[in-house]
């Protein structure tokens, strides 16, 4: 997935991290000069330095100028200079005629200035790919900008047709390349989510636009400094829209006396969490608190479930409020254990494959189906885009349901169903194929590297 992120232009977060690393790391040449000077002042004979087999061109040129020769061959000089580094080649580099187009800039000004919809990059992608019918998919919170974006793209890409996909989009798992292809589209632009489904897996050409949102970081820093004593260790996480801000404020918080950790659950980006996937923070990290940057609680609850003993706080960049958040861990775990216990005595199971975008993984479904067949348990298959209690209640002969769609549907709403509604993990626990979490932590790693959301055919066979 990290390769996919590079192909879709990772953006400012990586640039900020690299710049901070460069500032924090002193040059080796400066370190050597400082050490030599200190030894000379103390009257000590400087130690013979090992030969530098390969050095950068700039360092080699400086050494040659000092020695009055074109190639340094002394005891501590360079014996070879590095070849000139080729100019960096940027993928999806947008031409100046697009970036500096005054008419395009005027059109983009109709959109919120702090929302980066990457319009120039999208136009360039449409032009270079030769796309004629472009699907635009975004969460409901951004749909009010959809027609404006559509108008801009059709104006600056003559001859194309845009199609706004209006079905609900809960997250990155809902990317709907299947429907876009069925509607004759040859490019899908998916907004506000990371590339959970790789671009080499989608059935049509796909462009992910993260929609970086700029916020007032000064107020965030002031709020933290006012409420927490310096020296605290903070784990900072958020949704992909605020990922650049997370990396941007890290150095400022560290200057304020805080120790900052930006955790990662691979293959997601550092600091990024999903409603079903978040990093597990260890005791060695010595985290004092979790800070979530974003609105709403859905994503925050994921890391709270996965780290029940660490206090969690939410900074809402829209209301500019910092709040302490809590979660009913005991109640949730009790409800899920009850559902698992009931499922063990079920005589007929129903397997639901989620059809909302890419939510349903057929290989995960196949893994559970294999275990049920091995035990001789009758199965009914159901394909649903959205799962409601009333619909499942119509099939009263099914005594247990397993939904391969969104784990949070069972965790948040499982109590509303008349029959147990299990996640894939819970189903495997009920069948004795996975261990119960016991007195420990309920896992939230569905789209992690080894999560059940990433089940492959090989895992079913084994």
Curated annotation (Swiss-Prot):
Q: Name one GO molecular function term.
A: metal ion binding
Biased composition (Polar residues) is annotated at 35-44
Quick one: a GO biological-process term for this protein? protein histidyl modification to diphthamide
Gene Ontology CC terms, in alphabetical order: 2-(3-amino-3-carboxypropyl)histidine synthase complex; cytoplasm
* Pathway named in the protein's UniProt entry: Protein modification; peptidyl-diphthamide biosynthesis
Reaction it catalyzes: L-histidyl-[translation elongation factor 2] + S-adenosyl-L-methionine = 2-[(3S)-amino-3-carboxypropyl]-L-histidyl-[translation elongation factor 2] + S-methyl-5'-thioadenosine + H(+)
Chain segments carrying region Disordered: 1-87
Any matching Pfam family: Diphthamide_syn
Q: Where in the cell is it found?
A: Cytoplasm
Q: Which keywords annotate this record?
A: Cytoplasm, Iron, Iron-sulfur, Metal-binding, S-adenosyl-L-methionine, Transferase
Bound cofactor: record note: Binds 1 [4Fe-4S] cluster per subunit. The cluster is coordinated with 3 cysteines and an exchangeable S-adenosyl-L-methionine.
Enzyme Commission number(s): 2.5.1.108
Principal localisation = cytoplasm
Q: Look up the record and name the cofactor or cofactors this protein needs.
A: [4Fe-4S] cluster
EC category name: transferase
What positions does the entry give for [4Fe-4S] cluster binding? Answer: 173, 276, 406
Family to which the UniProt record says this protein belongs = Belongs to the DPH1/DPH2 family. DPH1 subfamily.
The role this protein plays is: Catalyzes the first step of diphthamide biosynthesis, a post-translational modification of histidine which occurs in elongation factor 2. DPH1 and DPH2 transfer a 3-amino-3-carboxypropyl (ACP) group from S-adenosyl-L-methionine (SAM) to a histidine residue, the reaction is assisted by a reduction system comprising DPH3 and a NADH-dependent reductase, predominantly CBR1.
**Subunit structure of this chain's protein:** Component of the 2-(3-amino-3-carboxypropyl)histidine synthase complex composed of DPH1, DPH2, DPH3 and a NADH-dependent reductase, predominantly CBR1.
Name of protein: 2-(3-amino-3-carboxypropyl)histidine synthase subunit 1
This protein's species is Gibberella zeae (strain ATCC MYA-4620 / CBS 123657 / FGSC 9075 / NRRL 31084 / PH-1) (Wheat head blight fungus)
User: By which gene is this protein encoded?
Assistant: DPH1
């Amino acid at each position: 997935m990290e390769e996919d992120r590079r192909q879709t232009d990772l953006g400012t977060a990586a640039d900020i991290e690299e710049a901070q690393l460069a500032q924090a790391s002193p040059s080796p040449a400066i370190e050597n000069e400082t050490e030599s000077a200190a030894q000379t002042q103390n009257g000590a004979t400087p130690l013979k330095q090992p030969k530098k087999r390969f050095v950068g061109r700039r360092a080699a040129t400086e050494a040659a100028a000092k020695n009055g020769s074109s190639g340094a061959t002394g005891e501590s000089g360079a014996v070879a200079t590095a070849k000139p580094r080729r100019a960096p080649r940027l993928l999806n580099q947008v031409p100046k005629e697009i970036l500096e187009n005054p008419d395009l800039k005027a059109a983009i000004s109709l959109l919120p200035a702090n929302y980066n919809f990457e319009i120039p990059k999208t136009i360039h992608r449409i032009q270079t790919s030769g796309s004629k019918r472009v699907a635009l998919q975004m969460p409901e919170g951004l749909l009010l900008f959809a027609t404006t974006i559509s108008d801009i793209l059709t104006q600056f890409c003559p001859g194309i047709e845009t199609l706004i996909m209006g079905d609900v989009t809960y997250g990155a798992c809902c990317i709907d390349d299947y429907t876009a292809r069925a509607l004759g589209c040859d490019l899908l632009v998916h907004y506000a989510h990371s590339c959970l489904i790789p671009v080499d897996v989608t059935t049509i050409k796909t462009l992910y636009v993260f929609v970086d949102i700029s916020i007032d970081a000064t107020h965030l820093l002031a709020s933290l400094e006012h409420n927490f004593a310096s020296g605290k260790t903070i784990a900072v996480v958020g949704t992909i829209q605020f990922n650049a801000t997370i990396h941007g404020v890290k150095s400022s918080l560290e200057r304020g006396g805080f120790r900052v950790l930006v955790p990662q659950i691979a293959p997601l980006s550092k600091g990024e969490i999903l409603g079903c996937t978040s990093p597990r923070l260890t005791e060695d990290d010595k985290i004092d608190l979790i800070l979530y940057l974003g609105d709403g609680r859905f994503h925050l609850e994921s890391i709270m479930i996965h780290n029940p003993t660490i206090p969690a706080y939410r900074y809402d960049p829209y209301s500019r409020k910092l709040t302490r958040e809590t979660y009913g861990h005991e109640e949730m775990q009790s409800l899920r254990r009850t559902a698992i216990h009931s499922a063990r005595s079920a005589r007929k199971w129903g397997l639901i494959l989620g059809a909302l975008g890419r939510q349903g993984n057929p290989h995960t479904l196949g893994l559970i189906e294999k275990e049920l067949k091995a035990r001789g348990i009758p199965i009914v298959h159901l394909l649903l885009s959205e799962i409601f209690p009333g619909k499942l209640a119509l099939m009263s002969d099914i005594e247990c349901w397993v939904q391969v769609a969104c784990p949070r549907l069972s965790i948040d709403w499982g109590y509303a169903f008349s029959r147990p509604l299990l996640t894939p993990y819970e189903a495997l626990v009920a069948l004795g194929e996975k261990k119960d979490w016991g007195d420990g932590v309920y896992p939230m790693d569905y789209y992690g590297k080894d999560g059940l959301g990433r089940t492959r055919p090989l895992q079913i066979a084994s």
